[in-house]
């Protein structure tokens, strides 16, 4: 099972580090990561394997929501089922 984590906001030191820390905390394996800096805007898309995750998916989303608030960024965690359903419509 996989999930996609997206991060968008004003660039600042430590974004990748903080997102990675939460991935480690919940045993999410980063399989692919892409980041771009456009002027002062930071964007990142991360594909993670959640097969070995600790806790529930809701708890992971809540932790990333807290990080989003703390850093003043938009961070979304979306389960692969969402993307699979979009292709079935």
Where do the PLM segments sit?
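A conserved regulatory-domain signal marking ACT and ACT-like small-molecule sensing domains
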Residues: 1-89
